[in-house]
Amino acid sequence: MAQKQIKVTLVRSVIGTKQSHRDTIRGLGLRRINSSRVLVDTPEVRGMIHKVGYLVSVSEA
């Protein structure tokens, strides 16, 4: 059975955000605005997305 995947896209700049939020964005594999990654939908990834939800958009991959 294939694991569910989600697409995460950075839609706002990380300038002026907390260092921990910038680290979380890097942990998700995002570098610049409009960069996207397809990630496995796990509780760990969901927690990271919840932390920086105001910077990213999420859709099903």
From Swiss-Prot:
**Protein name, as recorded:** Large ribosomal subunit protein uL30
Q: Tell me one GO biological process term.
A: translation
What is the source species?
A: Bordetella pertussis (strain Tohama I / ATCC BAA-589 / NCTC 13251)
Q: Which GO terms describe its cellular component?
A: cytosolic large ribosomal subunit
Annotated NCBIfam families: rpmD_bact
A GO molecular-function descriptor = structural constituent of ribosome
Top-level taxonomy: Bacteria, Pseudomonadati, Pseudomonadota, Betaproteobacteria, Burkholderiales
**Family matches, as PANTHER family:** LARGE RIBOSOMAL SUBUNIT PROTEIN UL30M (PTHR15892:SF2), MITOCHONDRIAL RIBOSOMAL PROTEIN L30 (PTHR15892)
Keyword NADP recorded: no
Gene this protein is translated from: rpmD
Task: Write the record's keywords in alphabetical order, separated by commas.
Answer: Ribonucleoprotein, Ribosomal protein
- Which family does the record claim for this protein? Belongs to the universal ribosomal protein uL30 family.
Quaternary data: Part of the 50S ribosomal subunit.
